[in-house]
Amino acid sequence: VNFMDISDRLHNPNNLSPKFEGFFIEMAMPGQKQRVQEIVTEAFGLDWNVKQIGDNSTEFEVTLNKEVLSVKDAWDKSYNLRSQPGVVDAQPLFAVPLSDRQDFNLEPEVVMERSIDNLNTDVEWSLKQMRVFEAWSRFFPDPNRPPGHGIIIGLPDTGYTEHPEIITNILIKKGYDFLKNDQDAKDELEAPSGVLLPAPSHGTYTSSLMSSPRGAQRNYPSGKGMTGVAPGAKIIPLRVCYSVILLSVLNLAKAIEYAADNGAHVLSISLGSGLFNKRLRSAITYAQKRGLIIVAAAGNFVPYVVWPAAYEEVIAVTGCDAQREIWKGSARGQQVDVTAPCDKVWCAKTKKKNGEIEYDVEPGTGTSLCTPQVAGIAALWLSYHGRDQLIQRYGAEKIPFIFNQILRDSCEEFPTWKPNKFGAGIVNAEKVLAAPLPDNATRSIIAPAQALEQHPAIDSGKLDTFAHLFEEQVFDSQEETNFMQVVEDNKKLQASLAELLQTTESELPQRLKEVGQELAFYLATNPELYQQLAEALKSENSDSNQLKTRTLTESSKPNNLDSVREILLQNVSEVFKTKLE
């Protein structure tokens, strides 16, 4: 590992670019690890490791021992792998800049801030808004059984610190560091060469919002204390990144599987990217089948809900402020499930100054902060009803869907709430715990197998992933979903992609099967490219709204996309290049 390179990339966000980590390979038949090894060796040589993942015996993770491939080479090799007999799909894996660091012509706020402008000095305002204390008093009256007792939350993040607000509830010996591959997930607050990181101790403030005991555990410089939603819950720290700038999708996937195998009941993921990734989806499915409730951040200052929050199996959380208004940086869209406090929420923070560690409680902002609070509510629900009893009654894999349904049914709409934008509304912990459990035969629970089909992969040839990425630009924002409008909006997107990929609309599904994954990758990791296509789509949408008398065929004719194609031609694989020229 080149620690100096890592340090430079982390310290200077402008230097960040996707970094190759390996491949995801899906085979047609189960139990073919030896065949995968043969394919990889024949194609690339001996320095590759093959590991079977998931429950189907058809999915494999392939990693390289030494050299690192360029993005272009990785995609070229993925097409080589796909062409081999028996291979259903091959997808390159990358560590990617986190979506809330990307420039989409928006101005992100600093995550942790001391500004007193519009600052709510009541450190428990977020808990009061979610009616957490009412839930405690009604459903956890025994002082010897604190709210959330018996529940374990897995936290893939930057690791733990010994902050007094969290340390008593951290299961240190159960943790794992996926950066160093050892059992100590401690957040070192700096990159390997000693460079201090922007937004340090991210894992500390997400931990504190879940399980900090009530009130200050010591005197802090701010003079404040704080309280977590489920102070009886324990946390497994899983260190997957140095800072919330560069996300290893491979590390996150491994951490999710590790949590499922090591006793976690809930997962809180305050990380995400714009990449639909089969390796990550495999891990999500693996955990969901074992009954883990997975909660993830919708994203900050991006025009779509990031993954893994966008997966159907995951509860996607966007954020609001103390006035019950949506926070301006919150991602929004149809994939959002619920809203929770995220703007100037008080949480624990650990800093390193001149080699000395300093602990404090400060306000922070971002969907990273609403996510662990909803995970805390999940812990309260499991603790109150008894997870073992829920498994006995429903089976493990239905628990996440039952909770998601009850959570959404218990939400409260707020003044600026819009359907298909902010989920069901602001979460209400008291209502969640008061809600009756469904009958075994209820049809309101989404069957796990059905949920897996609701967001098909790009290689199916469908538009879903692109419709998701450009939901804000393409789809009509009216409050009621109009079927004919959706058809027309899909037609516009289809026409634009067909022109971009130099094909007809009828042949577009086949073209997307061939190169759609690579196109989506560049759109998610290149802000300039995304912006160019978004503007073309938005312009087309505006034109069609002004000229209602045009026919559907005329209104769906896209703007010129030559500039988008020119950007793509600079970097793409040889296979993709032939489809663009």
Regions found by a protein language model. Give the residues of each.
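Substrate-binding/access-modulating region of protease and related hydrolase catalytic domains
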Residues: 142, 147, 213, 237-313, ...
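Short, surface-exposed ligand-recognition loops at beta-strand->loop->(often short) alpha-helix junctions
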Residues: 24-34
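Glycine-centered tight turns that cap/initiate beta-strands
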Residues: 86, 165, 313-316
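Hydrolase catalytic cores
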Residues: 238-241, 342-422
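C-terminal subdomain of the subtilisin-like protease fold in secreted/lumenal serine endopeptidases
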Residues: 264-269, 314, 328-330, 383-580
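Active-site core segment of subtilase-fold serine proteases
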Residues: 113-234, 247, 251-262, 266, ...
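Autoinhibitory propeptides
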Residues: 2-19, 42-126, 138-142, 528-581
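Structural recognition of the beta-strand scaffold that forms the well-ordered cores
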Residues: 24, 91, 152-155, 234-239, ...
